[in-house]
């Protein structure tokens, strides 16, 4: 009786790889061998490999059985629950014990004899699979018991804290009498700015806002720029020239020297001799570019009333220096007069 599926060997017989030979063919091989037929002739007649015939006959001569499988059955189980319990006890008493030491203790305590004592590999497998998780759980429980109580959390960034608008507002709020003052970093929690720019992250904007609020000078905001003009600035002091100290100007004119040997001509004029700046026309911020240019002036606002394009500050420059060379300019540098001073 041949199976319906399998592979074909060199003799033309069909076999299934990894499966034992059917019992009917095994019995036929033994019967032909008892009749005195050689194994090679049995192999050709039954179309079974010569190695398979020899193996079956050798097993039959030794055991008297033609059935496949291990002889005498499997080895009895040695890792009984009692053995596992003793192994767990040894491991709990001495966590650093080795597998071969556990094997020797099982023999010494009479738990096992030399026939059913588990091997070192079996003990290691028991320690890894069945007792390892329990040991780890015990260590975790002991760690939780000895763990100290958590300390109260400190406020975030309490050492290197930069001022924020909220802390500044909290500092400005007056504290009622009889109540101790609470620091700003503890009274109100920190809130991060809405944007993620570098100035907001580093707190530069909040610092500049506080400086502008605490400074005695008024800094106009963007909304007030359109209403500012020349007339809004305060007039210069009588002892100042063009907003500068008169003493400093006289000292500079006294000790100042012209570079490259050119005559030194002071460009400073008194505030009384200058014409006032033309008042700019008030332009609406919503005006389009097609508005009439009524606020424009033909000349420069800083030009002197009696000056010329060549001498805007009405300085007396001698005509003899008009087309002189460099040497002549050096010789006549002491004859130059500055009427503006």
Swiss-Prot record:
Protein's cellular compartments: Nucleus
SMART domains: PAX
Native source species: Perodicticus potto edwarsi
Keyword presence, Transcription regulation: yes
Lineage, uppermost ranks: Eukaryota, Metazoa, Chordata, Craniata, Vertebrata
Region (RED subdomain): 82-130
InterPro entries the record matches: Homeodomain-like_sf, PAIRED_DNA-bd_dom, Paired_dom, PAX_fam, WH-like_DNA-bd_sf
GO molecular function terms attached to this record: DNA-binding transcription factor activity, RNA polymerase II-specific; RNA polymerase II cis-regulatory region sequence-specific DNA binding
Full protein name: Paired box protein Pax-9
Stretches for region Interaction with KDM5B: 168-189
Functional note: Transcription factor required for normal development of thymus, parathyroid glands, ultimobranchial bodies, teeth, skeletal elements of skull and larynx as well as distal limbs.
Quaternary structure annotation from Swiss-Prot or TrEMBL: Interacts with KDM5B.
